[in-house]
A protein has these predicted regions:
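N-terminal first-folded block
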Residues: 3-38
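Helical mechanochemical/support elements of P-loop NTPase systems and associated helical scaffolds
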Residues: 4, 20, 46, 67, ...
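Short, ordered loop/turn segments at secondary-structure junctions
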Residues: 22, 41, 66-69, 88
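N-terminal positively charged helical leader segments and presequences
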Residues: 33-34, 40-47, 51, 60
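Short, solvent-exposed amphipathic alpha-helical segments in soluble enzyme
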Residues: 51-56, 99-100
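Mid-chain, well-packed structural core segment of small domains
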Residues: 56-86
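C-terminal structural segments of small proteins and small subunits
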Residues: 77-114
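Charge-patterned, long linear interaction tracts outside catalytic cores
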Residues: 111-139
């Protein structure tokens, strides 16, 4: 199993991956798919469907250098042609582990991961401020 596929396995175990065409379609329509992965030997129809899922969104779709059987083996299935990773940081780590030059996708995911990090910091600061002030009270 390659490094990239290890990240897919880890994402599945952490609940950060959607596997198969219907779940990937649902998560991308909801705008929550950071990275859509398509196996190298997946059909043209599957590739077109994946591209249509992310069309008009800021989600990234790539073909990875792994077969359906290799992707399936990584997550404990027979075969897997399409998957989506929902966490930008996990998607970024996986993309960095994959061979090949994917500069545009890396930049997009880096921006998404930075936005998520900033949002989490703001949420933490807000929660800390609410605790210090004793919470919101009605008069």
């Amino acid at each position: 199993m390659t490094d990239g596929l290890q990240y897919l396995s880890l994402a599945r175990k952490a609940g950060l991956a959607e596997l198969g065409e219907e779940p990937v379609g649902s998560v991308t329509r909801a705008g929550k798919g950071a990275l859509v992965l398509v196996a190298s030997d997946a059909s043209e129809h599957t590739w077109r469907r994946a591209m249509s899922f992310v069309a008009g969104t800021k989600q990234t779709c790539i073909r990875i250098p792994a077969t359906k059987a290799e992707m399936g083996q990584a997550i404990g299935r027979q075969e897997l042609a399409i998957a989506a990773i929902t966490d930008p940081n996990m998607a970024l780590a996986m993309l960095k582990a994959l061979p090949g030059d994917r500069t545009e996708a890396l930049e997009a995911l880096t921006q998404k991961a930075d936005r998520q990090k900033k949002h989490r910091q703001e949420e933490k600061a807000h929660a800390r401020n609410v605790r210090k002030s004793g919470g919101h009270t009605k008069k």
